[in-house]
């Protein structure tokens, strides 16, 4: 079992303990997508890891912690729609140049930085204030698992 499989399974285990519905794997086709914001269209490192997560669970959610899926029933938690919104005139944030938003919790945003190839948690208001910087998506998911366990020790 890969580290990503372990992380996704553990996140979903906690989610299920909290009473949330676990999302099935994404079975659709992945297309090239232009995220804009100075992000080159080809993102093999991003898509390899994110695609692997989606093929296990098309969206992770537990207690306000979410990693976006593709074409989910909750369009506000759709990876492509959320990133398209960041390109809307008036909503642009120069600090999100080169960053693919992949999720959030109540206080922070999760993104993939295409220039340094890192998976990052930053403050929702101060996007330039990095809280966690990880080599892999699995490591980033593990940071959220630790937070969930810490704040819900009675059920985890």
Residue ranges and their predicted role:
Residues 1-109:
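A surface-exposed partner-binding patch
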């Amino acid at each position: 079992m890969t580290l990503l499989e372990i992380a996704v399974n553990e996140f979903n285990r906690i989610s299920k303990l909290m009473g949330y519905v676990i999302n099935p794997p994404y079975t659709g086709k992945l297309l090239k997508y232009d995220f804009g914001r100075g992000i080159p269209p080809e993102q093999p490192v991003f898509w390899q890891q994110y695609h692997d997560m989606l093929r296990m669970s098309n969206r992770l959610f537990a207690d306000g912690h979410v990693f976006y899926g593709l074409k989910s029933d909750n369009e506000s938690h759709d990876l492509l729609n959320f990133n398209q919104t960041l390109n809307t005139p008036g909503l642009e944030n120069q600090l999100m140049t080169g960053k693919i938003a992949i999720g959030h919790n109540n206080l922070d945003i999760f993104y993939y930085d295409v220039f340094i190839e890192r998976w990052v948690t930053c403050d929702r208001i101060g996007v330039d204030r990095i809280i966690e910087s990880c080599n892999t998506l699995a490591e980033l998911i593990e940071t959220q698992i630790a937070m969930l366990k810490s704040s819900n020790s009675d059920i985890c």
